């Protein structure tokens, strides 16, 4: 039972910038497209780094006039060189993912590295999309009826010895309640774990009984 993939939730096509893109142009792009980060790519579209709002804000905070939200153009300089560019701002060698990775794998990757977004690469290593924490969380917006159907058909309907007709499945805002009878006690944790793995499930309440067990009174 596969999870949703990165491809199903990522933003694509994606805004990309070159290493020489200037500070102000980066700010304009983030504002225009209402995004919080942008990948820096080489001429072939392969990732060199990422520039985020946090990177831009750190630059503003370092200016001589920290009270100015719009520093004068001449203040956005690095040493004796020209305007600050993406190459100066970016986090190099970004952690990336692929379109066919599951949303769970992408979430673990973000959590492990403390990241808010990941570039998505095609088979040639070129940036074709971006996926953010918010994108991954969209799987929890699946309709209850869709979640229930997947549990009945893809979970209960595929476990040997389990009859979907003997198990009640209620879903409310992603919260699942299972009731009814399974033939053997060892099948209960299997059913519960598989239901928890369904995209969009927030919690699973167990009211299952092994075959032959007496229902609790009260």
What are these regions (language model features)?
Residues 1-218:
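Tandem CBS (Cystathionine beta-synthase) repeat/Bateman regulatory domains
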């Amino acid at each position: 039972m596969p999870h949703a993939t990165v491809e199903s939730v990522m933003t694509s096509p994606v805004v990309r910038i070159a290493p020489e893109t200037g500070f102000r142009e980066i700010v304009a792009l983030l504002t225009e497209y209402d995004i919080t980060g942008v990948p820096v790519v080489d001429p072939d579209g392969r990732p060199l780094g990422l520039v985020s709002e946090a990177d831009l804000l750190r630059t503003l905070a370092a200016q001589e006039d920290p009270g100015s939200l719009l520093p004068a153009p001449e203040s956005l300089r690095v040493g004796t060189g020209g305007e600050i560019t993406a190459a100066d701002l970016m986090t190099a060698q970004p952690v990336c993912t692929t379109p066919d990775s599951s949303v769970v794998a992408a979430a673990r990757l973000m959590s492990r590295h403390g990241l808010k977004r990941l570039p998505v690469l095609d088979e040639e290593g070129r940036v074709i999309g971006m996926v953010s924490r918010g994108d991954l969380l969209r799987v929890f917006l699946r309709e209850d009826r869709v979640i229930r159907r997947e549990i009945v058909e893809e979970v209960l309907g595929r476990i040997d010895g389990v009859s979907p007709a003997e198990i009640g499945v209620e879903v409310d805002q992603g919260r699942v309640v299972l009731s009814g009878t399974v033939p053997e006690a060892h099948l209960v944790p299997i059913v519960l774990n598989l239901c928890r793995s369904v995209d969009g499930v927030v919690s699973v309440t167990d009211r299952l009984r092994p075959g032959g067990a007496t229902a609790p009174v009260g």
